Swiss-Prot record:
Keyword rRNA processing: no
InterPro entries in alphabetical order: Leu-rich_rpt, Leu-rich_rpt_4, Leu-rich_rpt_typical-subtyp, LRR_dom_sf, SDS22/Internalin_LRR
Region of interest (Disordered), ranges: 317-342, 1479-1502
CC per GO annotation: cytoplasm
Protein's name according to its UniProt entry: Leucine-rich repeat-containing protein 9
Repeat positions for LRR: 53-79, 97-119, 120-141, 142-164, 166-188, 224-247, 296-320, 699-721, 722-744, 746-764, 765-790, 792-814, 822-849, 894-916, 917-938, 939-960, 961-983, 985-1009, 1011-1030, 1031-1053, 1100-1123, 1124-1146, 1147-1170, 1209-1232, 1234-1255, 1256-1278, 1280-1301, 1302-1325, 1327-1351
Segments of skewed composition (Polar residues): 1479-1496
Length: 1502
């Protein structure tokens, strides 16, 4: 046999030599010189003959049938080894190859990585295409640079690669990695540059099929250059991954804040219920305590009056129950002694009875508080679970998502009905449970498990040809997952189940027949919860379990594919090997180990089932493959207990009968004799009153003073009682104890049941030994305790119960630590253990070198992990870069510290950090800090957490210019220091929730802020939002729980409008529709807040002018209007107003400028058109339709715009409404402005002048640049005060209906369409006219017009902007005299009636010709002016018309007025002017009336 093996080895070696070009015969000579051997595809079944090649450096064996590695003992210089596709099953025999650098073992059957411990120089290792399940055995390979483990069976990475810090290339494609958490382990490989998880040559890992896979990898491994063979070295790609993750962290942080807010709201509800439950005990304690102190006061009076012996023991506290009496004064008579003794005994007996009742109610109160604390604890645990859900969502980048259901969700109702149907009250009767109340249902969306579930089911169905879709559905079931009943449901276990799937129960410690290797589920609530309740009930009997633990529970509902299922056999353990080709087994309820199985028959026949499905089979299911189970719902519930059921009665469940019985016992105790008469209350103290109460003659005699039960709030001159040793001031109204200061002999002070809020001013009580401060309103425990430590150094007994402490949990320990002289606290003796514990806590209240070594970390890079905790806390939990407390430390060890976490260390001050110059992340939450100090040298600090302290100011942060994140929740901040925020130029995250902040003024320069959390503060004014308008980077704002939300109805839209960059407000994303609604509501809205923002204060009464030109204002809301009572001028030109809006409420406004707006009316008009005629509607649609408002019926106008409308803005005198597009004056309702004096309406589209009848005081009216065609009868009829009227640039053809405006002095009608000279006559009805403009009309082309008007209108002083001088007037009169001499000789008429020849009915045309006129009599008319011959027959038809004119004389032609008439009639015929004359006239400048905004014209009346 041995010879055969040698023969085979020889043949193998010969084949080896042949394949490598070597001679077998010369192998001994040539072998040492050979460095490389190669064997491909058979011919080398085992590793033989390698000893002939001691200097071999490369060995390549491919496609052989080698099962083990051997024969390398002499290959000490081997550097590269290939054994691939060789059926190799184990790694061995490499320990002699210490110089090996490259090892290729791919395509084999290796299942374990082993035998590589000595390969310290190995740089390349390929183990792909094997059967490896676990990454292991690589710890010693610190030089490894390339590792290929593709196409194996690896499920997890863990910490197995942490030692391989030089690893640059890693290929894990084709494995079973399904969790993002596993990939985060690769972030600890600092040199990793090339990673493969779904290499195209292999199938992808399940994790690669999840959303955001690449984003997750690139964020955690930023140095990566290639991912899955793709180049990812571009900075843009890394930035995209970074920004995506940052946004997700912001999003989940916001949701975490939402959870915390909901938690606070729920806790507040619990506190309200607790407060209600405490009312009865507290009221009873107060009433009973008041009576006890009255009786004790009576005892003191009896003693002081000499009616009883001295040294009678008086009990002053609840725990003192000494009811013995002493004998009466021997000096009194026996009868007197007996009466006094009886009364004394009655008083003591009643005091004892009342104190017993006080003890009872105190115990009740403690039970309520204990129940409250337990309820709060369980509620916090519930919300903490939601926080963990969010953390899981973030870590899985949304591939595991939790959706909290509401009644509106269809799945919520289905799940709810399922739970109710699977709950049978009969099954829970033994535990005192009558029902179930569901608090929360959370739906689990696990994309990872769902993919596994679907793949597994699909694979099963592919191998089961007989199964159809319908049969598949029948195999699906929703079942309850059963946790270990002996352990409470741990959050980690619950999260593990929801994220990674259900665990297979392995009960190997049980007897063989009871062993289970499967996932345990059930379709019954009783089978799911029964074992847990039984276990808790047993513990409750032993008093080792809180009865409240019964009430709350959590269940997981999973979708289960049962596959092939059979009934469990009694004789076989439930293991996969015992049930071949079976996916699940079930066992009916009778097999379950439950104490209530005997009730089964009763259950099935009971009528108390309600809607439960207990008639169905209740059984347990055991599923062998956990991938057939998909957790879908998490349900939090509470059991409803039966009345008076043991283990479930809580203080809040007590019925009215019990309370009535307890109250009756109180009344019985109160009814005991003696009955004390009520004493008159003392409201203020004076010397007489003090002496009377103390029953003394002088102050020096007073040692005891009892002022119990009065209405005192001050103790005037109490310091004069130098001998006072005991003072009782309970049941008064003191808010401070400053008045009792410097009572140097005072030993006993009872100030219970008052309103004391602080001990500030409490001084000079060096002998005080007893102090009762219970039932007050103290809040700051440490501050008040330090006052007592300083000013009451001998204090031995202190009662501080029932105050409003900010941190009640630490009050007792702080009190014992701060006041070392105390022996009794809250009526209980302080034990040595309590003193020791308090001193231990106190000793740790300073930052020492030891605490720094324990809590510091030295990481140089911020942790790249998806976690919502502060960076310092993340490093404290996960980082291993700690300082060694046992090592010898040099002076430079301080500079290595980059992270420090000192949470819950009872710190009072931040000290000893001067040397931490490289500190970047720090957390000091849950301490007793009152100010920020000691951080001045930590200039590199980037994150700072100061939550849960007592800090009131941000002082001490100014030098932290690199600070990026600041959290200061649950403190006492009242605002922000502008200089501090300005110095924090890189701050982008600020959380200051649960403080006392009322102003945001200091945040105006926090330009880099992205996230701002300010919930539960005291912000109440909208104006505070303006302080944030400059924060253009602000994306998330949370102000929930501030008064501003309740005070302002449209708060949300208001904030969205003013902070345009915001994406989420109060935990809710801002929708595009909300942005539109905000613009509609607040766009262009002038409010008090806007004005305050501009002027910098809210002293609106100082304002006289408001100038908001060109501000895009659409509405005005200045409330309260009385604050603007001194405003007289408002300029809102160039805005978007459609009405006067809120301006009508300004009481004293005089000048209003609204040019260039869109004013439609004084008040907003209704949109309805029901009152309009068809013509009016058509005109509104098409302004050129020509119908205008002429179709408006008189009745309709009177109804809508008539005089019945009440006056508004009665102080307004000047109104500018130019260029508003106004087409209807009645719609403006200007008649309501009764005291208006100047009205400017230029540049509109007005075609009819109406609706001004009520403006009786109007003096100036401007209507130029409109579309007025005619003057109606009523246009100016009642404007009797009108002084100036401007109608220029309109379409007037005549001046009909122009009323006799007696006061009108200025009329501008230029640039209209007036053609007829006859229209000039109509101006004569205006007697006071001083200024007239008529240029730009067709009539103005007539050359005689100016002379005519000058002569005709004798009072006229300015015409077309040119002053009329005396010379002008004389020239005009001369002209008409000459005109008369010209026209009279040419007239064909009778001398007896000369005037008739000058009266014509037809126009006498004048024409310009080139024919010169002989003579010079008419030089003033121009050399080229001639009359047409057409005048010869102008009198033929007029003779009869004027026959009645008989009384004229021959000299009538010399009358100036008649001369003007003659000239006027001649001008009616028309005149043609020569070009030279027109040129001359056009050269004359005519001033045009303009109407710009001018403060000088505000109250002008011409």
């Amino acid at each position: 046999m041995l010879s055969n093996e040698n023969l085979n080895s020889e043949e193998i070696i010969r084949e080896l030599c042949a394949c490598n070009g070597l001679s077998f015969e010369k192998i001994r000579q040539d072998g040492p010189a050979t460095t490389t051997l190669e064997m491909f595809f058979s011919g080398y079944p085992k590793m033989a003959g390698l000893s002939y090649f001691p200097n071999l450096t490369q060995l390549i064996l491919v496609g052989q049938n080698i099962h083990c590695i051997a024969g390398l003992e002499s290959c000490h210089f081997l550097k590269e080894l290939w054994i691939t596709e060789c059926h190799l099953s184990k790694i061995q025999g490499l320990h002699h190859c210490a110089d090996l650098q490259k090892l290729y073992l791919y395509h084999n059957e290796i299942s374990v990585i082993e035998g590589l411990e000595n390969l310290l120089k190995l740089e390349v290792l390929w183990l792909n295409n094997n059967q490896i399940n676990v990454i292991e055995g690589l710890d010693m390979m610190q030089n490894l640079k390339e590792l290929n483990l593709a196409n194996n069976l690896i499920h997890s990475i863990g910490e197995s690669l942490d030692p391989n810090v030089q690893l640059e290339r890693l290929n894990l494609s084709g494995n079973k990695i399904s969790s993002f958490k596993e990939l985060t382990n690769l972030a600890r490989l600092p040199s990793l540059m090339d990673l493969g998880l779904k290499d195209p040559q292999y199938s992808p890992n399940p994790v690669c099929l999840l959303c955001n896979y690449a984003i997750h990898v690139l964020y955690h491994i930023p140095q990566l250059q290639r991912l899955d063979t793709y180049d990812v070295s571009e900075k843009q790609i890394k930035n995209l991954a970074e920004s995506t993750v940052v946004k997700k962290i912001m999003y989940y942080n916001m949701r975490m804040k939402n959870n915390q807010r909901q938690q606070r709201e729920e806790l507040e509800k619990v506190r309200e219920r607790t407060s209600k439950a405490k009312q009865v005990p507290e009221n009873r304690i107060r009433a009973l305590s008041f009576l006890v102190k009255n009786l004790e006061h009576e005892l003191t009076d009896m003693k002081s009056s000499g009616n009883m012996q001295a040294n009678i023991p008086i009990s002053n506290k609840f725990h003192e129950n000494n009811c013995d009496t002493e004998e009466s004064n021997s000096q009194q008579s026996s009868e007197r002694r007996k009466n006094n003794s009886d009364r004394l005994e009655q008083i003591h007996k009643k005091i004892c009875a009342l104190k017993e009742r006080m003890i009872f109610w105190t115990r009740k109160l403690s039970e309520v508080e204990k129940h409250h604390e337990e309820k709060c604890r369980r509620m916090k645990d519930s919300f903490h679970l939601l926080d963990q859900f969010l953390q899981t969502e973030l870590e899985t980048v949304g591939n595991v998502r939790f959706e909290e259901g509401t009644a509106a969700d269809s799945w919520f109702k289905s799940c709810y009905d399922l739970i109710v149907s699977r709950f049978c009250a009969m099954n829970f009767r033994a535990y005192g449970i009558s029902g179930i109340k569901i608090h929360r249902i959370v739906r689990v969306h696990n994309r990872i498990l769902r993919l596994k579930f679907e793949d597994k089911v699909q694979y099963w169905m592919d191998n089961e040809d007989l199964y159809t879709t319908e049969s598949y559905k029948k195999k699906l079931e929703y079942l309850f997952y059963i946790f270990d009943p002996k352990l409470p449901i741990d959050k980690k276990e619950l999260l593990h189940v929801l994220e990674n799937g259900c665990n297979i129960t392995r009960s190997s410690q049980l007897p063989e027949q009871e062993q289970v290797e499967a996932v345990l589920l059930t379709n019954s609530m009783s089978l799911c919860e029964g074992p847990r309740l039984e276990f808790l009930q047993k513990q409750a009997m032993n008093k080792s379990c809180d009865p409240e633990a019964f009430k709350d529970g959590i269940i997981v509902i999973a979708k289960v594919f049962l596959g092939r299922s059979v009934k469990a056999r009694d004789d076989l353990p439930i293991k996969p090997n015992n049930y071949a080709k079976v996916n699940s087994v079930y066992r009916l309820q009778k097999f379950a180990n439950s104490t209530f199985n005997s009730l089964n028959d009763e259950i099935c026949s009971s009528k108390e089932h309600g809607n439960c499905d207990c008639s169905l089979r209740q059984c347990e299911w055991l599923v062998f493959d956990h991938e057939f189970i998909l957790p879908e719902y998490v349900v939090e519930f509470e059991y409803i207990s039966m009345e008076k059921s043991s283990g479930f009665v809580t203080p809040s469940n007590e019925n009215a009968e019990d309370v009535s019985h307890d109250l009756k016992l109180d009344e019985d105790a109160i009814a005991l004799e003696p009955f004390l008469k009520p004493k008159p209350k003392i409201i203020s103290l004076d010397e007489k009153t003090v002496l009377s109460v103390a029953r003394a003659n002088i102050y020096s005699q007073i040692t005891v003073l009892n002022l119990h039960g009065n209405s005192l709030s001050k103790l005037k001159d109490i310091s004069r009682l130098n001998g006072l040793r005991k003072l009782i001031i309970s049941f008064n109204e003191f808010s401070s104890l400053e008045d009792v200061s410097y009572l140097t002999n005072l030993e006993y002070l009872d100030a219970s049941h008052n309103q004391v809020i602080t001990l500030e001013g409490f001084k000079g009580l060096g002998k005080l030994k007893y102090l009762d401060l219970s039932w007050n309103k103290l809040t700051n425990s440490r501050e008040d305790l330090h006052i007592l430590r300083k000013h009451a150094i001998q204090l031995s007994s202190l009662d501080i119960r029932y105050n409003f402490w900010q941190k009640p949990a630490s009050v007792l320990k702080d009190t014992i630590a701060i006041l070392p002289s105390l022996t009794h606290l809250n009526g209980v003796t302080i034990t040595e253990d309590e003193i020791s514990e308090a001193l231990q806590i106190s000793s740790g209240s300073r930052i020492t070198q030891a605490s720094l070594l324990i809590n510091a970390r030295t990481d140089t890079v911020k942790p790249r992990c998806l976690n919502l905790l502060p960076s310092a806390q993340i490093l404290a939990q996960f980082s291993k870069n700690c300082l060694d407390p046992n090592a010898e430390l040099s002076n430079s060890w301080y500079t290595k510290i980059t992270s420090l976490t000192l949470d819950s260390q009872n710190l009072v001050r931040i000290t000893n950090l001067e040397k931490l110059v490289n500190l970047r992340w720090a957390s000091f939450s849950s301490n007793h800090l009152t100010k920020i100090e000691g951080l001045e040298h930590c200039v590199n600090l980037e994150e700072l957490n100061l939550d849960d302290n007592s800090i009131s100011k941000l002082e001490g942060l100014s030098k932290l210019t690199k600070l990026r994140r600041l959290s200061i929740n649950n403190n006492l901040l009242a605002g922000f220091d502008r200089h501090v925020i300005e110095s924090l130029s890189h701050l982008h995250f600020l959380s200051a929730e649960n403080n006392n902040i009322s102003s945001l003024a200091g945040l105006q320069r926090g330009y880099k802020l992205i996230e701002l959390y300010l919930s539960n503060n005291c912000i109440s004014s909208n104006q505070e939002i303006y302080s944030l308008k400059g924060l253009n980077n602000l994306v998330i704002l949370d102000m929930w729980g501030n008064p501003i939300l309740l005070k302002h109805e449209n708060y949300r839209l208001f904030v969205i409008f003013h902070l345009s960059a915001i994406k989420a407000l109060d935990g809710v994303a801002v929708e595009p529709s909300e942005c539109e609604n905000a613009k509609d509501m607040f766009g262009g809205r002038l409010t008090s807040d806007m004005i305050a923002e501009r002027i910098g204060h809210q002293r609106f009464t100082e304002l006289q002018d408001l100038n908001w030109r060109t501000s895009s204002i659409r509405s005005i809301d200045l409330v309260p209007a009385d604050h603007f009572r001194n405003v007289q001028t408002v300029n809102l030109e160039n805005n978007n107003l459609t009405s006067f809006s809120g301006l009508i409420f300004l009481p004293n406004i005089k000048n209003l400028y609204l040019n260039h707006n869109r004013i439609e009316s004084i008040l907003p008009q209704q949109k309805s058109q029901s009152h309009l005629t068809n013509r009016q509607i058509l005109h509104q649609k098409v302004s050129s339709s020509g119908y205008g408002q002429q179709g408006t019926s008189k009745g309709s106008r009177d109804t809508v715009y008539g005089e019945a409308l009440s006056p508004v803005m009665q102080s307004l005198e000047v109104l500018h409404l130019g260029y508003n597009g106004i087409n209807s004056l009645p719609m403006l309702q200007l008649g309501r402005l009764r005291n208006l004096k100047s009205l400017y309406l230029q540049g509109n589209e007005i075609s009819h002048v109406e609706g001004l009848e009520n403006l009786q005081f109007l003096r100036e009216l401007v209507l130029d640049h409109n579309r007025i065609k005619a003057i109606a009868e009523t246009s100016f009829a009642k404007l009797n005060s009108l002084v100036s009227l401007n109608l220029e640039e309109n379409r007037l053809r005549d001046l009909n209906n122009l009323p006799p405006l007696l006061k009108l002095r200025k009329l501008l009608i230029g640039s209209n369409k007036i053609q007829e000279i006859s229209e000039i006559e109509k101006l004569e009805v205006i007697p006071a006219l001083v200024e007239l403009s008529i240029s730009g009309n067709p009539i103005s082309r007539k050359p005689f017009l100016r002379n005519l008007l000058v002569v005709r209108l004798q009072n006229l002083q300015i015409l077309d902007g040119i002053l009329i001088t005396a010379e002008d007037r004389a020239r005009a009169e001369m002209y008409f005299m000459e005109q008369q001499s010209l026209t009279v000789p040419n007239a064909v008429m009778d001398l007896g009636n000369p005037v008739s020849t000058m009266i014509v009915s037809k126009p006498l045309p004048l024409r310009v010709t080139n024919f010169p006129l002989a003579g010079g009599a008419h030089h003033s008319l121009g050399a080229d002016l001639h009359f047409n011959n057409g005048h010869e027959d102008i009198f033929q038809n007029e003779a009869n018309k004027y026959k009645k004119l008989k009384n004229y004389t021959v000299g009538v032609g010399h009358n100036p007025q008649n001369t003007q008439d003659i000239a006027l009639r001649q001008l009616r015929g028309g005149t043609h002017f020569p070009a030279s004359y027109l040129t001359q006239q056009s050269g004359q400048a005519r001033s045009q009336q303009k109407h710009p905004f001018n403060q000088e014209n505000e109250g002008r009346c011409v």
